[in-house]
């Protein structure tokens, strides 16, 4: 099985050294991600593409590799191809006929060829010869040069013929690590997840910083989103997850800051803390999900006041986005259902927030704030390797057993998404299996028969462990994790 990964146009116009460096980084990313799926994957970097090969030609492996390639930043498009050597144009025709004869039956088609190397023919001749031959051989097919049903793509490189069997649209953007590191402030809502995704797509290795205002359940939810984003779009590179207990800071603000200034002061405290964390981690910029005018703290005046507490660059990828645009992207990338279950905590501490904060007034209110509280919570920041979030969840749910053999009368709850469940159904014979996607579990688990024992199941055990912790924290004791 072979794939040809095309380069982003913005990479191809770089200087030769930069283009080579970016392509090498992309090759490394592709290799790192795909070898998590198939250890037999090999890659080869060319000037204008990257070749990906594997000896495992099974449909299941192909599907997993295709889905992974679609989510790697820096890939605008990739091709599934059949590669072979050829003798002449007629040989190209015969090889193309063997691959595409069935696909053009009762359809209109055209042939498009790209050629590199020295040959006694040009691309147009290949298109005409192969297209004419297919038209004669497949009687029900008809040539149509504009808007055909099927376009047959051929690529010729010296003596090698690449017959494209399928073209896939990639994520686009830049390869991760071609830009510098950023620290994304995660609340768990739609905005912070989408802004993190935008920076990953742009090639920045994106670390996550969470200010906990809502207890362990809130932290579990944000960890889920952060792990999901990393695992789906950024798994080629290690990143960190920083967890800061911000409840003491909120308490200090509630006690000592005038009500209308609370929202802006809270955001300034978060930026101060994030700046210290970024400096320690040698991270070059902060990322927030703020969108201009969306809430009271996100007016131009207030954002300007918030910015004044740091010299570190603050990136706001969603500044000009409407809320519906953000939700649409969240749905597309898969974070919408996570975010639906996480309440917004930042907005609850100020009843009549100012939309035009005055810097001197804010600084006066902050004069009543005990900054030792902020220093203390920053010094106690918990730092995780994002890859260890699953392991950390396992340690935290020590009261939840991991079950290999299903007890009598126990019910298995498959918490995978409907798509995952459909692709790989969980078949357990006579055992009762309920299907409740992880993003609905928090609202639907309480409706189940509480006299029964429930075993949560997902493919890798990460989501099931995190969900078990969430249910434990909410008082449900009849929960275990099923790990066959």
From Swiss-Prot:
It catalyses: [ThiI sulfur-carrier protein]-S-sulfanyl-L-cysteine + a uridine in tRNA + 2 reduced [2Fe-2S]-[ferredoxin] + ATP + H(+) = [ThiI sulfur-carrier protein]-L-cysteine + a 4-thiouridine in tRNA + 2 oxidized [2Fe-2S]-[ferredoxin] + AMP + diphosphate; [ThiS sulfur-carrier protein]-C-terminal Gly-Gly-AMP + S-sulfanyl-L-cysteinyl-[cysteine desulfurase] + AH2 = [ThiS sulfur-carrier protein]-C-terminal-Gly-aminoethanethioate + L-cysteinyl-[cysteine desulfurase] + A + AMP + 2 H(+). Pathway: Cofactor biosynthesis; thiamine diphosphate biosynthesis. It is found in: Cytoplasm. Residues 63-167 form the THUMP domain. GO terms for biological process: thiamine biosynthetic process; thiamine diphosphate biosynthetic process; thiazole biosynthetic process; tRNA 4-thiouridine biosynthesis. GO terms for cellular component: cytosol. The keyword Ribonucleoprotein does not apply. The keyword RNA-binding applies. It comes from the Bacteria. One of its GO terms (molecular function) is ATP binding. It holds the Pfam family ThiI_fer. PANTHER family: TRNA SULFURTRANSFERASE. Catalyzes the ATP-dependent transfer of a sulfur to tRNA to produce 4-thiouridine in position 8 of tRNAs, which functions as a near-UV photosensor. Also catalyzes the transfer of sulfur to the sulfur carrier protein ThiS, forming ThiS-thiocarboxylate. This is a step in the synthesis of thiazole, in the thiamine biosynthesis pathway. The sulfur is donated as persulfide by IscS. This is tRNA sulfurtransferase. It comes from Colwellia psychrerythraea (strain 34H / ATCC BAA-681).
């Amino acid at each position: 099985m072979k794939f040809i990964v095309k380069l982003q146009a913005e990479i191809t116009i770089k200087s030769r050294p930069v283009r080579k460096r970016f392509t090498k980084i992309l090759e490394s990313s592709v290799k790192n991600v795909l070898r998590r799926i198939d250890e037999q994957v090999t890659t080869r970097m060319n000037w204008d593409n990257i070749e990906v090969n594997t000896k495992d030609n099974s449909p299941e492996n192909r599907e997993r590799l295709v889905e992974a390639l679609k989510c790697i930043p820096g890939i605008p498009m990739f091709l599934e191809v059949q590669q072979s050597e050829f003798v002449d144009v007629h040989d190209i025709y015969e090889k193309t006929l063997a691959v595409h004869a069935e696909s053009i039956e009762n359809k209109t088609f055209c042939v498009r060829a790209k050629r590199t190397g020295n040959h006694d023919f040009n691309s147009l001749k290949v298109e005409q010869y192969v297209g004419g031959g297919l038209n004669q051989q497949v009687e029900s097919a008809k040539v149509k040069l504009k808007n055909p049903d099927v376009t047959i793509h051929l690529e010729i490189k010296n003596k090698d013929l690449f017959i494209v069997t399928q073209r896939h649209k990639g994520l686009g953007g830049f390869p991760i690590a071609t830009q510098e590191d950023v620290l994304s402030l995660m609340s768990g809502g739609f905005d912070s997840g989408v802004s993190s995704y935008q920076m990953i797509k742009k090639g920045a290795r994106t670390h996550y910083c969470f200010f906990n205002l809502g207890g362990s359940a809130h932290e579990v939810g944000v960890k889920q989103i952060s792990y999901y984003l990393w695992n789906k779009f950024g798994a080629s590179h290690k990143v960190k997850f920083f967890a800061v207990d911000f409840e003491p800071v909120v308490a200090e603000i509630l006690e000592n800051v005038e009500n209308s200034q609370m929202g802006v002061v809270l955001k300034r405290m978060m930026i101060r803390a994030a700046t210290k964390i970024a400096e320690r981690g040698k991270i070059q910029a902060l990322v927030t999900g703020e969108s201009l005018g969306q809430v009271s703290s996100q007016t131009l005046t207030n954002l300007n006041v918030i910015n004044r507490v740091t010299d570190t660059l603050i990136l706001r990828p969603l500044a000009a986005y409407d809320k519906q645009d953000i939700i649409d992207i969240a749905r597309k990338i898969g974070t919408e259902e996570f975010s639906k279950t996480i309440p917004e905590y930042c907005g609850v501490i100020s009843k009549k927030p100012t939309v035009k904060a005055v810097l001197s007034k804010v600084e006066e209110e902050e004069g009543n704030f005990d900054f030792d509280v902020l220093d203390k919570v920053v010094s106690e920041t918990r730092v995780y390797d994002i890859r260890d979030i699953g392991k950390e969840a396992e340690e935290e749910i020590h009261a939840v057993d991991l079950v290999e053999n299903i007890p009598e009368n126990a019910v298995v709850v498959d918490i995978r998404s409907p798509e995952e469940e459909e692709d790989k159904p969980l078949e357990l014979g006579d055992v009762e299996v309920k299907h409740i996607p992880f993003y609905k579990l928090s609202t639907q688990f309480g409706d189940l028969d509480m006299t029964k024992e429930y075993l949560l199941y997902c493919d890798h055990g990460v989501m099931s462990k995190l969900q078990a912790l969430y249910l434990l924290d909410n008082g449900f004791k009849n929960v275990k994790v099923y790990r066959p």
